[in-house]
Amino acid sequence: MLDIKLFREQADTVKSKIELRGDDPKVVDEVLELDNERRQLIGKTEEMKARRNKVSEEIAEKKRNKENADDVIKEMRELGDEIKENDAKLNEVDNKVRDILIRIPNLIAEDVPQGDSDEENVEVKKWGTPREFDFEPKAHWDLVEELKMADFERAAKISGARFVYLTKDGALLERALMNYMLTKHTTQHGYTEMMTPQLVNADTMFGTGQLPKFEEDLFKVEKEGLYTIPTAEVPLTNFYRDEIIQPGVLPEKFTAQTACFRSEAGSAGRDTRGLIRLHQFDKVEMVRIEKPEDSWDALEDMTQNAEAILEELGLPYRRVILCTGDIGFSASKTYDLEVWLPSYDNYKEISSCSNCTDFQARRANIRFKRDAASKPELAHTLNGSGLAVGRTFAAIVENYQNADGSITIPEALVPFMGGKTEIRPVND
């Protein structure tokens, strides 16, 4: 959520930033109009309260002097009614302002490229060279079924489309990837591992920006009023919700592996086969809570943490900056890492790393103190995939496939696969 002071002091800047996202900048004028009404109501209420205090003194004086106080008592009651009426109006205006503010996205960083869609994202780095096969490579959805690593048909019977059973070596590979990623982040990148709730309340979803705007993308347990998490960013970022972080604690670096649940509303017909776009998938997440002056360096570092996984696994990838028309609601700047998938003959998103500045912290009321005597300040929050496990699984299967139908295990994963160096057809 944005600070209303920005609307008062930098209205033109806020308008231009909102317009860059393709949204209507008139919302700024609406906020300012309501804010002006709000301040007038506050001023009027303060005047009435001051008058009420004076009338109270007049009543007391009249009673001391044994004079008739009926007229001032009547005025006192009228003032009380007017104050209540004004407070109700003020509460209504406050709610209107808040309802607008919570739907306005974060302000975009200065170096974010302008564009209307993902086609205008800007590549800033490329690592590795896509493999040239001397045979016709297969798509991962065919390979995993041939190798008995996954069963989409039975998953559809149990749960419907966009679900999967991972079986035998498929389950082993998924677990190995999760363990490898968590080990890398905790032992080499300095993150603290967490195991989080995977059902959260509406306040938690509001804190990270999923609610109210993106409710259709979520799965909800109606009876309990809880939501399944779309990413571990949600519980990790909200760890300090409504708290003041004490001096010396920041920076905080959290990582967690969770299942993630997404309705994929609006994605009908996209990536309908395989592991790329499921309703339920595993992901290792990184979340950082930083002092404002450190958050931009933290974004670069966190992105490099995700890149280190891809490089050690030997998976070709590229880094892009998301343009103004593709960046997420809560983010000020986002890097996407896209891994090479032969079945698409293209790069596909495998990680998204964002600096949300103080946007989520204001919604979730996450503050910190620099020292014992200082006033609390809003922290900056960052999040990044480190990595999406299912997409990493798919990338390994496709990029490490062999002509005989087997899959070579990347060297970095072998210790997490119980020493297994390849996955071969079951009849071998």
From Swiss-Prot:
* This protein's GO CC annotations: cytoplasm
Transmembrane parts of this sequence:
none
Which pathway does it operate in?
A: Aminoacyl-tRNA biosynthesis; selenocysteinyl-tRNA(Sec) biosynthesis; L-seryl-tRNA(Sec) from L-serine and tRNA(Sec): step 1/1
One GO MF term attached to the UniProt entry:
serine-tRNA ligase activity
InterPro entries cross-referenced by the UniProt entry: aa-tRNA-synt_IIb, aa-tRNA-synth_II, aa-tRNA-synth_II/BPL/LPL, Ser-tRNA-ligase_type_1, Ser-tRNA-synth_1_N, SerRS_1_N_sf, SerRS_core, tRNA-bd_arm
**Main EC class the enzyme belongs to:** ligase
Q: Where in the cell is it found?
A: Cytoplasm
Could you tell me the Gene Ontology terms of the biological process aspect for this record?
selenocysteine biosynthetic process; seryl-tRNA aminoacylation
Q: Which positions bind L-serine?
A: T231, A232, E233, E285, S385
Which NCBIfam families does its entry note? Answer: serS (TIGR00414)
Family, according to the entry, reads as follows: Belongs to the class-II aminoacyl-tRNA synthetase family. Type-1 seryl-tRNA synthetase subfamily.
Self-association or partners: how does it assemble?
Homodimer. The tRNA molecule binds across the dimer.
Return the protein name. Answer: Serine--tRNA ligase
Organism whose genome encodes this protein: Staphylococcus haemolyticus (strain JCSC1435)
